[in-house]
């Protein structure tokens, strides 16, 4: 079905309607896809499918590939992450060469995590439809684009046709009213949102994030929020573009220039929800109540403020939540009624498509400066791209991290997921700036706590979680 034809539309409905290529009676509409981002893990079978059917990539100018999931963060050696990783990366290189697709490979100055390089290169622009064979494609929605993850068969379909069948989703508005307190980050905001909606609260919806606390965010902060839209079950998350967006986009490699940029801004400024447009669901949070957040369980909705006690089954009314809490506490090795700061951590991971941009590096370095990583902790800082790495090194952030005892690594997805050499051992506890704390996500039987970069850096130095609002006391 197509979006409503009335005068008042949501941002999502405007972008969706603008991309309907074919709307046959009784069928899901076919959407045109503006950008297709490709990486080494979900693309091999898709290219094989093209080859078997004698097809070409329809729009090589709108298709961009990189290596990120499997890459080693310690060396540029393609063999370093094992045989499967090597095969996937070599296959991507072969496929991109054969089909004429732009590839930012291991040794390219633009290599990095796909959801970091898209925005920083100006590949991502407002009002676009953007897909990738990766669940955190929602990141690009920070620009007011409709961005979502797709499966491998859909990757093949987009490569071949530059289109995708897509039904219209339900709409949800999540408004964060007012201003956050000092030191509260985009990561804290989105974790607080998921804590309220639960990890399934957005299922079947496309979410628009709005409110003063959202528009106050930088583009990098907005990307963190939209990145985790999938973690409340949503198909995608969008934020309306504004002057902050246009200033970020200007002068990037693939951004429009001159009169074309001015014309683009004129169009982009129409990409906002109309007065009178209705949403299927509305969620409201008061920004001033948001504190530094830490997950305690095995989904991102199992989250508390750092100064709260770990909940137990008795804190929940629904039996399914009681059972889930009991199981999560057992897996995480936690005890209800205690504080998260009572438990030592083993590893810290600052990186991922959620929090590996230059502002994240700066926030972590500000905490690390003049401090030392605790003796019981291994702490990794993994920039999201070669561009982020170069900028951080230009600012001397790498030296701050190394001096404090952090490991300064090469760009890649790293310890977000156990697909390379960066992973947790059984029962190791990790403060992570990534987006998923599922069982085994960072390594078999590993225990993941999701936090902001500042909270992760503080935990690394203290050896356990601390409230960054009390930081002077925390490192004494």
From Swiss-Prot:
GO terms for biological process: L-leucine biosynthetic process. Keywords: 4Fe-4S, Amino-acid biosynthesis, Branched-chain amino acid biosynthesis, Iron, Iron-sulfur, Leucine biosynthesis, Lyase, Metal-binding. Its cofactor is [4Fe-4S] cluster. Its EC number is 4.2.1.33. Binds 1 [4Fe-4S] cluster per subunit. Pfam families: Aconitase. One of its GO terms (molecular function) is metal ion binding. Pathway: Amino-acid biosynthesis; L-leucine biosynthesis; L-leucine from 3-methyl-2-oxobutanoate: step 2/4. It catalyses: (2R,3S)-3-isopropylmalate = (2S)-2-isopropylmalate. [4Fe-4S] cluster binds at residues 353, 413, 416. InterPro entries: 3-IsopropMal_deHydase_lsu, Acnase/IPM_dHydase_lsu_aba_1/3, Acoase/IPM_deHydtase_lsu_aba, Aconitase_4Fe-4S_BS, Aconitase_4Fe-4S_dom, IPM_dehydratase_rel_enz, IPMI_cat. Heterodimer of LeuC and LeuD. NCBIfam families: leuC, PRK05478.1, PRK12466.1. PANTHER family: 3-ISOPROPYLMALATE DEHYDRATASE, HOMOACONITASE, MITOCHONDRIAL-RELATED. Catalyzes the isomerization between 2-isopropylmalate and 3-isopropylmalate, via the formation of 2-isopropylmaleate. Belongs to the aconitase/IPM isomerase family. LeuC type 1 subfamily. This is 3-isopropylmalate dehydratase large subunit.
